[in-house]
UniProtKB/Swiss-Prot annotation:
<feature type="binding site">
    <location>
        <begin position="143"/>
        <end position="150"/>
    </location>
    <ligand>
        <name>substrate</name>
    </ligand>
</feature>
<dbReference type="InterPro" id="IPR020843">
    <property type="entry name" value="PKS_ER"/>
</dbReference>
<dbReference type="InterPro" id="IPR013154">
    <property type="entry name" value="ADH-like_N"/>
</dbReference>
<dbReference type="Pfam" id="PF08240">
    <property type="entry name" value="ADH_N"/>
</dbReference>
<dbReference type="InterPro" id="IPR013149">
    <property type="entry name" value="ADH-like_C"/>
</dbReference>
<dbReference type="GO" id="GO:0000166">
    <property type="term" value="F:nucleotide binding"/>
</dbReference>
<dbReference type="GO" id="GO:0016218">
    <property type="term" value="F:polyketide synthase activity"/>
</dbReference>
<dbReference type="InterPro" id="IPR011032">
    <property type="entry name" value="GroES-like_sf"/>
</dbReference>
<dbReference type="Pfam" id="PF00107">
    <property type="entry name" value="ADH_zinc_N"/>
</dbReference>
<dbReference type="InterPro" id="IPR047122">
    <property type="entry name" value="Trans-enoyl_RdTase-like"/>
</dbReference>
<feature type="binding site">
    <location>
        <begin position="269"/>
        <end position="270"/>
    </location>
    <ligand>
        <name>NADP(+)</name>
    </ligand>
</feature>
<keyword id="KW-0560">Oxidoreductase</keyword>
<comment type="pathway">
    <text>Mycotoxin biosynthesis.</text>
</comment>
<dbReference type="InterPro" id="IPR036291">
    <property type="entry name" value="NAD(P)-bd_dom_sf"/>
</dbReference>
<feature type="binding site">
    <location>
        <begin position="48"/>
        <end position="51"/>
    </location>
    <ligand>
        <name>NADP(+)</name>
    </ligand>
</feature>
<dbReference type="GO" id="GO:0140781">
    <property type="term" value="P:ilicicolin H biosynthetic process"/>
</dbReference>
<comment type="function">
    <text>Trans-enoyl reductase; part of the gene cluster that mediates the biosynthesis of ilicicolin H, a 4-hydroxy-2-pyridonealkaloid that has potent and broad antifungal activities by inhibiting the mitochondrial respiration chain. IccB collaborates with the hybrid PKS-NRPS synthetase iccA to assemble the backbone of ilicicolin H. The PKS portion of iccA and trans-acting enoyl reductase iccB work together to construct an octaketide, and two methyl groups are introduced by the MT domain of iccA during the chain assembly.</text>
</comment>
Amino acid sequence: MDATLPSIHTALKILGPNNVSVSENTALPVIQPLDILVRVACISINHVDAKSADMSPSPGATSGTDFSGVVVAIGSDVPKESFRSTNGMKPVQIGDRVFGGVFGNNPLRRDNGAFAEYVAVPARLVWHIPGGMDFSTASTLGAAVATVGLSLFQYMQLPMPTTTSTASPDNGPFVLVYGGGTATGAMAIQVLKIAGFRPITTCSSASAGHATELGATATFDYRSPTCGAELREHTGDTLTLALDCITDTASMNICYEALGSSGGRYVALDSFPLRAHTRRSVVPDWVCTYSQFGHPIAWAAPYNLEARPEDLLTAEAWYVVAQKLIDQGLITPHPKEERLGGLAAIGEGMEAVRRGQIKGKKLVYPISNELCAAA
């Protein structure tokens, strides 16, 4: 550890189900040889942060996924690593502004999470913040970009875009994004458009305009009793791919009704209700964004997953592509609401997210006023 770094920092710790508390005497995360250490400027709250703290708490673990900040230390093997330079990415150096996501509430690594003054992250799995983007905005992107990459290019096996789309969205295959008003749904719409597909989405009327601006070729009100039938009619019974960003019985039923008579693939962002798997011609699966790190997920069932090395490989490839898209300004961040109070206020924000009180935006909390003011 660099002698100029503190030996302890402040972090938001999991105490029990839906119970978090600020600890001011926590050891800094251990920097693995291929990790970097980031001083956190801002964080944003994801649904998984609140849900996992309630459903599968890891007492003593640091909470939080999404962060932005400044690199303050690098692991011993990072300078020898050629992955980033070989793939046309800027090497990570001390002083760089970066953003990304980590596995918070991790029972196998309780010292590390985004809701803290410092966070450790693999050097391969972090993005540089482009010029003109502030820490607050950057903190909203990590989990959404990573989850969309795994969902589309690993679990749906779609071809990854290079830089910009070469296919016309007017002629590409349809892909349904259920929940286009969510952060991940909005990201999926954009990436699908860039990749040359025709994204269609379900959302509220309040989110429909934004979804269209992002690239959705059609929007449908999920509250309509004929939503599934309308989707199937619009796609001419040809829909074979559905990404469910809500994942409950109602959303799964609509996705299954929308998929064409030949069937297809249904990918959820949570463990899906088995009772809603009603068609043999549809292959269901679900994504946990933390599988991108290539380690087991030791949460309670059904969220206990073995390591998936193939997810790590896809994530590494996607991070390279996504950095180019972000640098070119092709990715629009989700709307956000910035709240004050730092780490001590995050618990209240997590509760608001858990209760479904935050819609169409992400909650952001500045952690280091010094870094945010200097940016």
